[in-house]
Amino acid sequence: MRILIANDDGVYAPGLAALYDALADYAECTVVAPIQDMSGASSALTLDRPLHPVSMPNGFIGLNGSPTDCVHLGLNGLLEHTPDMVVSGINLGANLGDDVLYSGTVAAAIEGRFTGRPAFAFSLLSRLPDNLSTAAYIARALVEKHDRLELPPRTVLSVNVPNLPLDHIRGIQLTRLGHRSRAKPPVKQANPRGKEGYWISVAGDVEDGGPGTDFHAVMQGYVSITPLQLDRTFREAFDGLESWLENVL
């Protein structure tokens, strides 16, 4: 089996190397990852310039594009053999609740939804790599069992791992996405020459993080697995919209 590995932290990220090392003796793994950190890139595709793959000394392929670019090229002609599945991560930082809308890690997995196998996005709840070995172990264990899964086509599994040693993990829970409140306002700042700019600020506080959510699971020491689908249609809104549209045309 052939696995395409991507991420959004960049080709030099320790989480990417940890994921590759965890899977390299299980399948034929190829890494295509952004040359620079592309956190928050979501599902952006680069359309205004050409993309140039670069072979790295460790055998990884770096790309001057987004995480989605990496998977798009990796599945569509960049590689000699088309990968059978896509695994993304390991992200240093959580991708919980609304985070999945912005996450390049999750977006890379979403771009891998057409392979016929589940795509995985792995995230560790820390900006530091101290417990990457825990997330790598979980990634290997889950990917190894993927052929026993019976899921609808184009399912993406977002996996968040608590920042704990493996023997402190309490188990694994299936979860739904929680929700955050509105993000904190951007921070206005002037550079040394007096030109003002803005920094995107931190995510909002947890607003919906009760039992059953991804937030709750990881805070209790459990690995959270949230199945995602591309269809974001809000069907409960149909009734209100139908009455609103009466007599418009």
UniProtKB/Swiss-Prot annotation:
CC cofactor note: Binds 1 divalent metal cation per subunit.
Keyword set includes Disulfide bond: no
A Pfam match: SurE
Record has Hydrolase as a keyword: yes
Encoding gene, per UniProt annotation: surE
HAMAP family: SurE
Listed GO MF terms: 3'-nucleotidase activity; 5'-nucleotidase activity; exopolyphosphatase activity; metal ion binding; nucleotide binding
Binding site for a divalent metal cation: D8, D9, S39, N91
Entry superkingdom: Bacteria
InterPro entries: SurE (IPR030048), SurE-like_Pase/nucleotidase (IPR002828), SurE-like_sf (IPR036523)
The name this protein goes by in its record: 5'-nucleotidase SurE
Catalytic reactions on record: a ribonucleoside 5'-phosphate + H2O = a ribonucleoside + phosphate
Cofactors, names only: a divalent metal cation
Entries under Gene3D superfamilies matching the protein: Survival protein SurE-like phosphatase/nucleotidase
Organism classification: Bacteria, Pseudomonadati, Pseudomonadota, Gammaproteobacteria, Pseudomonadales
Protein family (similarity comment): Belongs to the SurE nucleotidase family.
Localization of this protein: Cytoplasm
GO cellular component: cytoplasm
SUPFAM superfamilies: SurE-like
EC number: 3.1.3.5
Alphabetical UniProt keywords: Cytoplasm, Hydrolase, Metal-binding, Nucleotide-binding
Entry function: Nucleotidase that shows phosphatase activity on nucleoside 5'-monophosphates.
